[in-house]
């Protein structure tokens, strides 16, 4: 193995609820030349911890952990479980809080709807919260979001929602996470609003905060170039 290959960064990308690797299509294209990219398996596991532990079992050495939404919970858990292995932490369109009881009930209602044979109706119902108003007018973008949800399917949707409901509040862990970190959020994100990103950034010791104008929850798809640039900057900091 050449010295260059031996020193290549590893980049772990964790998708969000109802999302596949296509969530990071543009970032994979932009960054694959400088990092070995691994996509977290979020299917069929009933806890965020199980998703994170599988990553630690399957990947050797140090890596930069990036997650969007539910994937952010996985990235945070990786940093908490194995801080010595996480060279950089990227938290996109996510938060460090546990679900409130009201949010858990909303998730239970969506699970119930999906089990009544109405799974195809779940994602269109969520679209106004996943994309900005401008993003909702982009037919190609909407088609990609719907295709990801169909690929995930009802059973995995249920297990992912259960994992999200069971996650821990990680805000108390943030001040101990000393690795270079990035917190990024769209200013039009109603699922994980910018205030939550600002709180996380204020608690992380070595954090860059980026808020993107006119962007909703699925920031990596709505603002691919800006997100790729932010991740490239995080890789630079992690490699320094």
Region spans (language model):
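Conserved alpha/beta-hydrolase catalytic His-Asp/Glu region
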Residues: 99-102, 117-176
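Short beta-strand/loop motif that positions the catalytic acidic residue
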Residues: 177, 183-185, 189
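Flexible "cap/lid" loop of the alpha/beta hydrolase fold
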Residues: 48, 80-81, 85-124, 129
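Acidic beta-to-alpha connecting loop that harbors the catalytic carboxylate
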Residues: 16-17, 187-189, 214-216
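Conserved HGGG/HGGXW glycine-rich cap/lid loop of the alpha/beta-hydrolase fold
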Residues: 2-54, 68
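Catalytic histidine-centered segment of alpha/beta-hydrolase-like enzymes
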Residues: 215-228
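Gly/Ala-rich beta-loop-alpha elbow adjacent to hydrolase catalytic centers
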Residues: 67-71, 75
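Catalytic histidine neighborhood in serine/cysteine hydrolases
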Residues: 194, 198-217
